[in-house]
Amino acid sequence: MGRKWANIVAKKTAKDGATSKVYAKFGVEIYAAAKQGEPDPESNSSLKFVIERAKQAQVPKHVIDKAIDKAKGGGDETFVQGRYEGFGPNGSMVIAETLTSNVNRTIANVRTTFHKNGGNIGAAGAVSYMFDNTGVIVFEGTDPDHIFEILLDAEVDVRDVTEEEGNIVVYTEPTDLHKGIAALKAAGITEFSTTELEMIAQSEVELSPEDLEIFEGLIDALEDDDDVQKVYHNVANL
């Protein structure tokens, strides 16, 4: 499945850490999920999933509660999901997933970010066909074969199960992510460090130090945009 997940997580953690910007983005995602259904995670599975992910990212409880309270209070903002695809230097590819209350603002900002940082924004589908939408579940463990058997018995469509640095990493079909989580919980595994839908590059490129500096500036600028929730790329040495 490409780069080791442990390496991806280590670089991401070193890059953004538990910052207020991460909290704010989760706040928006929680609010949007609560507005689309009931503001109660026990009756709104989408909201429950976002809250679980927020806790994995160490988002404080007061941030989660504030977003839910805002939805309960009848906040009138409507958020729309989007995806923008583009290219960086020397065969590098980028996908930016957004959640915004102002689509025109987001389109303009993302396009400007690409152009100012050595990239070019592409049409829908220009890049995403080179990535696989994949469910990723990570938790402590050292026996991938046993975990594979658990998931197989539960008829979860699994792409791969690996052991990386004391962690089990499960890759599922995107439609079976929640089924996989449920099967693991039923088997007594309840603590997860990651439960995400991710776009994983089918192949990767390595950039020269000069190109890497340009590309890193592009990724940083996209991640700094308040409307951008996730950024995926195919650069192995970032």
Curated annotation (Swiss-Prot):
It is found in: Cytoplasm. Keywords: Cytoplasm, DNA-binding, Transcription, Transcription regulation. Its main location: cytoplasm. GO terms for molecular function: DNA binding. The keyword DNA-binding applies. GO terms for cellular component: cytosol. It comes from the Bacteria. Transmembrane segments: none annotated. GO terms for biological process: regulation of DNA-templated transcription. Belongs to the TACO1 family. YeeN subfamily. HAMAP family: Transcrip_reg_TACO1 (MF_00693), Transcrip_reg_TACO1_YeeN (MF_00918). This is Probable transcriptional regulatory protein LACR_0237. It comes from Lactococcus lactis subsp. cremoris (strain SK11).
